[in-house]
Regions:
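Catalytic-site microenvironment of enzymes
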Residues: 12-26, 32-329
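N-terminal secretory signal peptides that target proteins for export/translocation
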Residues: 1-17
Length: 329
């Protein structure tokens, strides 16, 4: 795909293609807010127990083997929407022709917001805290590998309006890759009750593992899939296993097709942040925080380092000779 883009770059055909791409991109940005607003059921991946949902089955309280106190969310240091600079249109160029790490911009989207925190872990820590810590570590790893243009993206407000803000910010920043950072939960029907440090909570030890999502409606799906597979490959190389529950009927409306059984890449075609960004986009669920054992791992600096190393390795391979691994796609 990227080789074909270079082949026609100097021709009249290439000019017409770029002109149509620019027009389509501008139209997409204008239509974005109404589109995102209409997608009300999309609050990213499902997150946490619903106040309206059925009460989970009760399980006798038990003391965890290892305790972990709720930690305050780290102080944000990120790109704010109000501070965005002039738009960069480099995202319209083929990725292979501009994959110089020092100039290649990866936007790390911190899933959820301080006002709408996403899932709640088994020990009652908000997902947003996990997302921010991990995104900050990934940013450090990427910059250490020479990806100096990496940007951390924080949005504010409620979940649904923030979807449009994320897409608009990524498009405005001229990102070459968009990676949204999340931590996983399960549907309400799979949750059980327990107590931790005298407080009621919910857990499900049934599933664990990371998962990677892409949208086949993204304007550059093939490159999205490529980067997602590289992340999955790198996570697997670190000894991690992907979550396999998304293909099961028990997941209900959260069921998704598995696109690569080797790397744990799933399709999530209608997710706004994956389909409406104008650059390749991937969502990483780093692990399950509703699983009591995995939550402890996700809360450790060691696990954040492992995940950060995997993402950095994927980015380095992505910026290597593209023709070497585009074939299987």
């Amino acid at each position: 795909l990227l080789s074909s883009g270079r082949k026609f770059a100097g021709s009249d055909f290439g000019f017409r293609c770029r002109r149509r791409t620019v027009i389509a991109a501008v139209a997409a940005l204008v239509l974005l807010p109404s589109e995102a607003g209409a997608a009300g059921w999309l609050s990213d991946i499902f997150k946490g127990p619903s106040k309206q949902g059925k009460s989970p089955a009760h399980v006798a309280s038990r003391k965890p083997a290892t305790s972990a106190k709720r930690a305050a969310a780290p102080k944000p240091h990120a790109v704010r929407l109000a501070a965005l600079g002039p738009a960069n249109l480099n995202f319209l160029k083929p990725a292979a022709s501009m994959c110089d790490p020092s100039k290649f911009r990866i936007v790390l989207d911190v899933g959820h917001t301080a006002e709408s925190e996403g899932a709640t872990s088994a020990r009652n820590v908000p997902e947003f805290t996990f997302n921010l810590r991990l995104a900050q570590r990934i940013e450090e790893k990427l910059k250490a590998e020479g990806f100096a243009e990496t940007r951390l993206l924080l949005t504010e407000g409620k979940a649904r309006p923030s979807l449009a803000k994320r897409v608009a910010a990524a498009n405005h920043l001229g990102a070459n890759l968009f990676l949204s950072i999340h931590h996983d939960s399960v549907p309400n029907s799979l949750l059980e009750d327990w107590e931790f440090e005298g407080k009621k909570g919910h857990f499900s030890d049934r599933f664990s593992g990371y998962s990677v999502f892409v949208s086949r409606n993204n304007p550059d799906f093939k490159t999205s899939l490529l980067f997602a597979e590289l992340i999955g490959k790198a996570m697997k190389a670190q000894g991690l296993q992907y979550a396999q529950q998304y293909t099961q009927a028990i997941m209900g409306r959260y069921q998704h097709p598995l696109l690569n059984k080797e790397t744990g890449v799933y399709g999530y075609d209608q997710l706004v942040v994956l389909r409406s960004t104008r650059m390749p986009a991937v969502l990483l669920e780093a692990g399950s925080i509703i699983n009591r054992d995995e939550e402890l791992k996700m809360d450790s600096p060691e696990r954040r380092d492992i995940t950060g190393n995997a993402v950095a390795a994927a980015a380095k391979e992505f910026c290597g000779p593209q023709e070497a691994f585009l074939g299987p796609l």
